[in-house]
């Protein structure tokens, strides 16, 4: 699975500084207490292996279809990042408005390239979105 840890503030907005404070803890007691003041969720956006089968060469659309099915059986601390198709601009604006640093736009036919950036994936942040057309997007 590919995803990222996200901490949320009291209003449910993503809070990177809070996550970084939690990440820096080393004392076991403080780490246990952090689950109360800094709950985190693992937000999943890709599935690389399933049922003993490598999926990295499968198109993103298929990997996410399988991931959505898998996520239905997972703990509440794990969330599926439900991307959007064809409404990238509105999705981007909503993501930035709710505190995300931007979005990832990914071509639905793209394979997963472990450890590498792909031209089929674009990170779109405020000030960096000119001239890009979104074919699909996921928060994160």
Where is each model-derived feature located?
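Catalytic cores of nucleic-acid ligases and guanylyltransferases
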Residues: 1-140
């Amino acid at each position: 699975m590919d995803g990222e840890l996200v901490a949320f503030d009291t209003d449910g907005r993503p809070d990177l500084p809070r996550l970084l404070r939690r990440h820096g803890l080393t004392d076991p007691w403080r780490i246990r207490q952090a689950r109360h003041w800094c709950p985190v969720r693992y937000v999943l956006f890709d599935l690389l292996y399933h049922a003993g089968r490598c999926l990295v060469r499968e198109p993103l659309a298929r990997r996410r279809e399988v991931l959505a099915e898998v996520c239905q059986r997972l703990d509440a601390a794990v969330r599926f990042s439900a991307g959007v198709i064809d409404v990238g601009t509105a999705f981007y604006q909503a993501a930035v408005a709710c505190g995300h640093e931007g979005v990832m736009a990914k071509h639905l036919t793209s394979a997963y390239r472990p450890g590498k950036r792909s031209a089929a994936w674009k990170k779109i942040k405020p000030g960096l979105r000119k001239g890009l057309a979104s074919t699909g997007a996921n928060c994160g």
